[in-house]
């Protein structure tokens, strides 16, 4: 489109990048990647394809070369999170306060508060555990991703830093015709200083704080994934002893 400022990306129209220039209008301050995480596969999600990963690696190298050999600090946004986000959780027992059940590996988790802060209301529907997209590893190797933010899981809005130093988190839910309204409809704001973009600040703005009323959609919230937690806790309370026997 005539007024689109994004640079055409890989083989799909939804994977691209946008350069953000400094106040002089000439020097690149930072970069934004948008990655299409595609569709479902085998009951889970595929994550990005090899062609998209190849494009990202090439684009990262191109920007680095044009920046005097220094990686261009970048924020990355995509719908489905990478599976490495599970590294911010601690496995726990089902009756632990705040425990969340994961359908991916049938384990219970709580947020590791030494690594992340915010709401953790459902286990991430990340790319499949048995799929190796190589995306997260590429972020680490290229050294340009200063933050990766996701959507999809409406009951999550936490942000944390991985063991590799990459900030990962959720943007919060904005829609009013989807589950998770009881957790608050939000937008995530990013504040960056062109003199030091890596030291950026991000926070959520809540609909109820602006409008003085809570967003609620009882129908969709009834079928929220958080209901799974309640069902599984009842199941474990009744049959947990049998489950533990099978695990042994």
Q: Across the structure, where does each feature detected by a protein language model lie?
A:
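Extended active-site neighborhood of metal-dependent phosphoesterases/phosphodiesterases
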Residues: 1-69
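A generic structural motif
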Residues: 5-10, 75-76, 203-205
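Solvent-exposed loop/turn segments at secondary-structure junctions
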Residues: 37-42, 80-84, 153-156, 173-177, ...
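His/acidic metal-ligating clusters that form di-metal
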Residues: 31-33, 45-157
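Binuclear metal-dependent phosphoesterase catalytic core
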Residues: 14-26, 32, 121, 126-127, ...
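Metal-dependent catalytic neighborhoods of phosphoester/phosphodiester hydrolases
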Residues: 1-3, 88, 159-164
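Acidic/histidine-rich helix-loop elements
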Residues: 3, 8, 43-45, 97, ...
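Membrane- and interface-active hydrophobic/amphipathic segments that mediate membrane binding, fusion
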Residues: 227-248
């Amino acid at each position: 489109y005539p007024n689109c400022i994004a640079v055409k990306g890989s083989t799909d129209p939804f994977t691209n990048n946008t350069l953000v220039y400094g106040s002089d209008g000439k020097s690149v301050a930072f970069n934004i990647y948008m990655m299409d995480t595609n569709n479902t596969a085998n009951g889970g999600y595929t994550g990005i394809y090899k062609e998209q990963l190849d494009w990202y690696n090439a684009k990262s190298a191109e920007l680095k070369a044009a920046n005097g050999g220094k990686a261009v600090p970048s924020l990355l946004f995509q719908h489905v999170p990478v599976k490495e986000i599970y590294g911010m959780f601690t496995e726990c027992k089902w009756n632990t306060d705040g425990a969340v059940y994961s359908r991916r590996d049938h384990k219970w988790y709580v947020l590791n508060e030494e690594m992340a802060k915010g709401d953790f209301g459902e286990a991430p529907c990340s790319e499949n555990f048995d799929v190796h997209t190589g995306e997260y590893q590429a972020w680490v190797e290229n050294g340009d991703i200063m933050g990766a933010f996701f959507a999809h899981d409406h009951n999550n809005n936490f942000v944390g830093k991985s063991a590799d130093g990459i900030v990962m988190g959720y943007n919060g839910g904005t829609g009013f015709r989807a589950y998770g309204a009881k957790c608050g409809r939000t937008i995530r704001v990013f504040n960056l200083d062109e003199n030091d973009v890596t030291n950026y600040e991000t926070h959520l703005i809540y609909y109820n704080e602006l409008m003085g009323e809570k967003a609620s959609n009882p129908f969709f919230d009834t079928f929220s994934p958080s209901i799974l937690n309640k069902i599984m806790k009842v199941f474990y309370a009744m049959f947990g002893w049998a489950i533990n026997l099978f695990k042994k």
